[in-house]
Amino acid sequence: MLKVSDFDHIPVLLYPTVDALNVRPGGIYVDCTAGGGSHSAEIARRMKGQGILVSIDKDDAALAACMERKEDFAGIDWMPVKSDYKDIDDIIRSLKIGKVDGIMADLGVSSYQLDTAERGFSYMKNGPLDMRMDPDEWLTAAEVVNRYSRDELERIFRDYGEEHHAGRIADGIVERRRTKPFTRTTELAQAIKDYMPGHGRGEDQHPAKRCFQAIRIEVNHELDGLETLLNDGIRKLKPGGRFAVISFHSLEDRIVKEAFRSAESPCTCPRDFPVCVCGKKSLGTVITKKPIEPTEEEIEINPRSRSSKLRVFERNDNEQYN
């Protein structure tokens, strides 16, 4: 079994995120991305031995490492759940815990996943083309790279990676796999670099970064699941409950920003209407008008935190959409 000491992960925006939840003893809290348990443990510490904490992850190794911390927090009903965060509605219903006081999600890939070559997430480490957050799922990065059509590859590179050279890279991958399928991460990373104009020179990041992000999102259906999590999670909060989400790239951040904005101002009436007639009322307030970002000190300690953004929503007592 993986131990906490083995799960090398530096949490991002740890204290700002848990501060935003206003954790109190006796409350009910859900960590949708347990990882190695750093955020869950800080929530548990502030619960002072009272309440319910649900830690969700679809990665067995991450969940095992998280739950090793449980013995340090006697009195808390700490529940591990192996699942996808998009199923938050079903999870909360099945646990029969009713509405909750706080929900958080850290959408980044963990340091452990990136640094473990066998998981296939990193373009810097030689490993199998996998990228599954849940190893029990069937779709792998190799399946995407070797079996998707040229147009499908261009779409995911463009839409999920915001890659300017999506078409050219897709052409190169399709041409190359005709003679030999891609099986290793560094092999694909080098090919992507070779297919880019100027071989990626002048880039402020590795030429393969955006394409690897795109493939990972496709393999794990991350963006579809995120929209479901946000919409269902907001409706599972008690009045005054908080939802805190850490994103790591512009696609995620736009989805979080829009979901929170729509929940705060859902009215669909034309702007020239003097009063609202659609009947859609606000579900709460966006606490972070601008996202909270890591300090320079945190970035120096953990460079992977550089692109992170924290947004927070607070629920009101309107029950209209529940």
Language model: regions and residue ranges:
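S-adenosyl-L-methionine-dependent methyltransferase catalytic core, i.e., the SAM/SAH-binding region
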Residues: 1-322
